[in-house]
Amino acid sequence: MKKELFALKGMICYSKNQREMVFMEDSYVVCENGICAGVFSQLPEEYKDVPVEDLGNRLIIPGFTDLHLHAPQYAYRGTGMDLELLDWLNTITFPQEARYADLSYAKKAYSIFVDDLKHSFTTRACIFATLHRPATELLMDMLEESGLATMVGKVNMDRNGSPELQEESAQASAADTRQWLEDIKRRYDHTYPILTPRFTPSCTDELMTELGKIQKEYHVPVQSHLSENFGEIAWVKELCPTSRFYGDAYDMFGLFGTKNAESELDYTAASANSNSCPTIMAHCVHSTDEEIQMIKDQGVYIAHCPESNTDIASGIAPIRRYLDMGLHVGLGTDVAGGFSLSMFRAIADTIQVSKLRWRLMDQNLAPVSYTHLR
């Protein structure tokens, strides 16, 4: 494979860690096969002959990672803000996602989504597709061509959907998921599969059992939703009465992080360790103390989605508490609960809603500031 190597010159800004920002004027960042090989005030001898694009005094920053968004929902972003989660799903989301059974519609809608994502400041993303395997593979093909680094999930749901948006059985859902994973095996360089049970109310115990087996068989990460809305949490308790809390309804099937976790959220790490289950859970707005402890112990990543949590009135997650506890927290736009792909907006929203939580709900928990979001 031909080696791709080039350098950018300009004002470089990046964070070494949460507390240390680096600013370098008139400096170079070297890119090798899509990965940053280093940042230098002067080009080292080994890179002296690489092509350089001089950007003058323009700012060069790392791309953002959007930890949670729904590609099929981009077509109707900004609608349904008068509804809460469950009504929003039934009234708007499920009927719209059913349209992706039509590949011609999926191609048109996903083309717009991928193009807009490519021209945003996001370079990595964890993405929900729909339950439709052909449309999901189409989306992955488009994302691969875009050059973005993504994880994409074919959604699983065998209950509480709609006649047009529900898989016929747990066995059918599991079989289609296995077929999807086989179809895309070794097909992409920077587009990866991620197992995607929509959320507990959409998946029977039988399906969750099958997904647990698939996770161990294929060593894929997992993404889903957790403790987003009071009505959702109560519903999970009705559907899974033996679960101690919402997260336990995933954990009992081996779909909630890694016991004694120390691993990073890395697809290759998941592949190398048969006991590893890197997991992203979106929202965690109303997580109990016991659930939070399991999130910490098992290395589950929280995708904080402040715009969505505001738009559909879910609440304000205690993000400062999670950060102080050392939990893994990232940001998501959660389109179309959120209406914008802008991660700059997600950063600003995180700070704003954290201040509102401090002022209106809990003055013992300080708000976050930009220093927490580097």
Regions found by a protein language model. Name each.
Residues 222-229, 312-314, 320-346:
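Short acidic/histidine-rich active-site segments
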Residues 2-4, 13-62:
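Histidine-rich, glycine-flanked metal-binding segment
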Residues 216-218, 276, 296-303, 325-329:
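Glycine-enriched alpha-helix->loop->beta-strand junction motifs that scaffold or abut catalytic
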Residues 138-282:
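Metal-coordinating catalytic core of metallo-dependent amide/deamination hydrolases
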Residues 131, 156-158, 199-201, 228-230, ...:
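Active-site-proximal loop/turn and secondary-structure-junction residues that shape catalytic pockets
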Residues 30, 77-148, 172-187:
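Alpha-helical scaffold segments that flank or form the walls of functional sites
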Residues 371-374:
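Conserved small/polar residues in nucleotide/adenosyl-binding loops
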